[in-house]
Amino acid sequence: YDNNGKLLLEYKADKPEIKPTPDPAKAAKQPKEIASIEQLFLTGLHLEQYRHATYDPMAYYMEALEREPGDIRCNNAVGLLNMRRGKFEEAEQYFHTAIKTLTERNPNPYDGEPYYNLGWSLKMQGKYDEAYSAYYKATWNAAWRDAGYFGVAQIDSIRKDWNAALEHVDLALIHNWHNHKARQLKASILRHSGETEKALKFIEESLTIDKFNLGCRFEKYFIGNNLTELQEMTS
């Protein structure tokens, strides 16, 4: 209980009974043995999530793309695998293919993820103008609005366009108030803009949400040059 008598934590023991043993995990079929593209995608996704030691999710996605080269989800999945492997140019092509299918009949897609991922791959190659456009297009979809605006704000910051960066990071925070990366970026933007008091106030607000926001704590050290802050982070 807290000081006001509110229940904070409660524990109830399970009844002493023997529960049925869960079914053992089934081995994945070989890609050629799987009939549908849907199941190929889901199998690849499952293998990624569980980081299987002997099965390669890429094989399942590539089998799906042999049957349907324009499949949106499998192109996006292959692109992401290539991103994690540092193959940014290869990833870009798969995201383009996913987007081509996604926008065949509707220029404003129902899912902004391939556009966001395309922006990420382009940014990692230093193609900032193209990345900027891709990130912006991702914001058409509400689910990717905060991530898209955050990507735009990052490129604004790379260009040292602090006014635009502040505008876009605020848009990211409107859609995800607890985006801790965006909070650190906003603190950095305010510092670069000479708004140190605003930056410190925003940092304190952010640390009330999450005391482990190390990006904001480092910004606080950077502004005040207070070694105590740095020591607390590294202790």
Which residues does each PLM region occupy?
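Position-specific recognition of the canonical hydrophobic site in helix A of tetratricopeptide repeat
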Residues: 48-49, 83, 116, 123, ...
